[in-house]
Amino acid sequence: MKFDCAIVGGGLAGLLCGLALNQYGLRSVIISRGQSALHFSSASLDLLSALPNGDKVTDVAQGLQQLAEQLPEHPYSRLGAGAVLEYATQTEALLAACGANMQGEARQPHLRVTPLGTLRPAWLSPEEVLLAPFAQQHVCLVGISGFADFQPHLAAAALGQHGVTAAAVEIELPLLDVLRDNPTEFRAANIARVLDDENLWPALHAALLPLAQQHDLLIMPACFGLADDRLYRWLQTRLPCPLRLLPTLPPSVPGMRLHSQLQRQFIREGGTWLAGDEVVKISHRQGAVEAVWTRNHGDVALRPRFTVLASGSFFSNGLVATRDSVREPILGLDLQQTLPRESWYQRDFFVSQPWQRFGVKTDALLRPVLGGQPFHNLFAIGSLIGGFDAIQLGCGGGVCAVTALHAARQIHALAGDRP
């Protein structure tokens, strides 16, 4: 099977790279083993929230310049501030084209409300997520009786520290009794599947209406809208006060919806999606990838002109750790960090952990290195790349997006007009 590009990994980085390649008119295939980290994500993306010295970033352009001085090995520092902001703006357009309605812009982070009622900086957030500062003063956090993945009382107490009068209430929804027999089934994703039935929407509206008549704002757990935001918009037009949603413990409905929107758009535009498959081998010679072998296709190899590794970090097995070493499992690529095991972590759990910065070495074009030599037609993107701590710096989503679009641009330039 011949493709212009084979992308290993179907998470945020892989999908954005595939969407960008579609726009360039290149034929690509994504090999996805299963659920990506987006299924466990709030669907809010961060670009750059903090610097290595601990300073908060309020102006991203200025923050990128300071980052280049403090952490020159960061992917942003290597690409340059101008390119990062350009790719971020392009990402916003790609997400909008997929039907993902987001709020925020690249140059200035906003503060979103977390499930615990705290404030966290972000670059983009789904439009139903509550942002600070708050225009409303009398807020009601609405939980669902028996639903343990959202604690309205904790969120209300935290919001109260920001000068908001916040009440916590739980509503009874008998329409969800079908899920209550098994506590493991009473999760946000399963509730969302039940509420996909439009015949049940009036019952939810009836439960929320008395609360909406008494408060300036309702905040619910994001437990509906798995495929789209129709129910959210339906409620918005019928309740007398605004409604906002907060992500729950994983699996996350907003994250699952964002993944589905990107995946559907990729396929709609002509991309090929190999679900439930896994790359077991990549054949290469003299620095060029020749074939990609997958578990499900056996002896039938994919033969792409270019290959992109978007296989993630430890969470997605893009990196694998043994008792005394870390390796990239498909090709055994060179890693940016090779610290002895006793230096992998800090005893203080809340400080930046060295293992978070582990990842593959790449050159300026994001081509990974094997034995000190970069590949000619292989690129690495997203959290597989080393040199940064996404949690400490608040840059995980941004690195995925920026490196994905940078790799797509390099592939387009190298592909030229060849068939």
Swiss-Prot record:
Keywords: Flavoprotein, FMN, Oxidoreductase. One of its GO terms (molecular function) is glycerol-3-phosphate dehydrogenase (quinone) activity. It comes from the Bacteria. GO terms for biological process: glycerol catabolic process. Its EC number is 1.1.5.3. It catalyses: a quinone + sn-glycerol 3-phosphate = dihydroxyacetone phosphate + a quinol. It holds the Pfam family FAD_binding_2. GO terms for cellular component: glycerol-3-phosphate dehydrogenase (FAD) complex. InterPro entries: FAD-dep_OxRdtase_2_FAD-bd, FAD/NAD-bd_sf, G3P_DH_GlpB_su. Its cofactor is FMN. Pathway: Polyol metabolism; glycerol degradation via glycerol kinase pathway; glycerone phosphate from sn-glycerol 3-phosphate (anaerobic route): step 1/1. Belongs to the anaerobic G-3-P dehydrogenase subunit B family. Composed of a catalytic GlpA/B dimer and of membrane bound GlpC. Conversion of glycerol 3-phosphate to dihydroxyacetone. Uses fumarate or nitrate as electron acceptor. This is Anaerobic glycerol-3-phosphate dehydrogenase subunit B. It comes from Klebsiella pneumoniae (strain 342).
